[in-house]
Swiss-Prot record:
One of its GO terms (cellular component) is mitochondrial inner membrane. It is found in: Mitochondrion inner membrane. The chain crosses the membrane at residues 31-51, 82-102, 112-132, 181-201, 215-235, 269-290. This is Solute carrier family 25 member 53. It comes from Homo sapiens (Human). Belongs to the mitochondrial carrier (TC 2.A.29) family. The keyword Transport applies.
Length: 307
């Protein structure tokens, strides 16, 4: 397969992932690319995300969510963007780096089976959930329009969380809604990495331009994964929008509340799904394509140095 020009994606994957034991299983440029690409895609798709968030909280139509945001004023349209910008930048670093490290730990010399990719993706999702859940918590409070007066800034939210006791800071503050976050991130990462490479390899064999297989693979995987886990996304948004000591509903009570407010219909839980498809397609398509491009350039430079 190495000599076939129409299969560059697979050739690259063999060079990057089937490294010899004892060698580094990650590349600093790949980490940097994950950070930069996630930063850019988050900024570009944040308005879409905010509309989706309002739908998840208030179960309203797209037009009503847009009208509500516009009524609050353009100056608030990007309110709450700093936590996701920081968290997504860290996510890009953790997502690809941790996955590759775990994959090479599970199978140092390859080939990497579906089970290896699933396990490495699952564990990288756990790391991601532990590291980034506090950022998402602050972000969801900031984006809830009902709390703008009480919590106008990130600092005001952090001040509220730090006023709790140690256990309260974790369970009611920074890690509120952690269990559904853990399930969503671990399963989502496992699904994404399990099928990203097979789809990309299949498209690369069709003689398409280098960037197309990665873009399509990331878009398809991001869309399918997001739709499969969308009920968990809605549950997390609702749980993490609550703040304070009193009347803090449990995980089960929050799930029941989401189900009841959606009229006990699965279709209403998926309200906003069209925007989720668009946001996930753009975000994961760009992230995967840019990461693949940087990875390819990195290895091209290394080959020139060795020649």
């Amino acid at each position: 397969m190495g000599e076939q020009n129409h299969s560059p994606g697979k050739e690259l994957q063999h060079r990057t992932r089937a490294e010899a034991p004892g060698k580094k299983s990650w590349h600093s440029q790949a980490y940097a690319l994950g950070a930069v690409s996630n930063f850019m895609s988050t900024f570009l798709t944040f308005p879409i995300y905010k509309v989706v968030f309002r739908q998840q909280i208030h179960a309203m139509a797209v037009s009503e969510a847009v009208r509500q945001l516009w009524h609050e004023g353009p100056q608030y349209f990007y309110r709450g963007i700093y936590p996701p910008l920081l968290s997504k930048t860290l996510q890009g670093t953790l997502l690809f780096g941790t996955y590759d490290s775990l994959l090479c730990f599970l199978s140092p010399v390859g080939p990497h089976t579906l089970g290896h990719r699933w396990a490495a993706g699952l564990m990288s999702g756990v790391v991601e959930a532990v590291a980034l859940s506090p950022f998402e918590r602050v972000q969801n409070v900031l984006q809830d329009g009902r709390k703008q007066a009480r919590f106008p800034s990130t600092f005001s939210i952090l001040k509220e969380f730090n006023s709790y006791g140690l256990w309260g800071r974790l369970s009611l503050g920074y890690y509120r809604g952690f269990w559904p976050v853990l399930a969503r991130n671990s399963l989502g990462s496992a699904l994404y990495f399990s099928f990203k490479d097979p789809i990309q390899d299949g498209l690369a064999e069709q003689g398409l331009p280098h960037w197309v297989p990665a873009l399509v693979s990331g878009s398809v995987n991001g869309t399918i994964t997001c739709l499969v886990l969308y009920p968990l996304i809605v549950l997390v948004a609702n749980m993490q929008s609550h703040i304070g000591w009193q009347n803090m509903p449990s995980l089960w009570a929050s799930a029941q509340d989401v189900w009841n407010t959606r009229g006990r219909k699965l279709l209403l839980i998926y309200r906003g799904g069209s925007l989720v498809i668009l946001r996930s397609s753009v975000t994961w398509g760009l992230t995967t394509a840019i990461h693949d491009f940087l990875q390819r350039k990195s290895h091209s430079r290394k080959e020139l140095k060795t020649d």
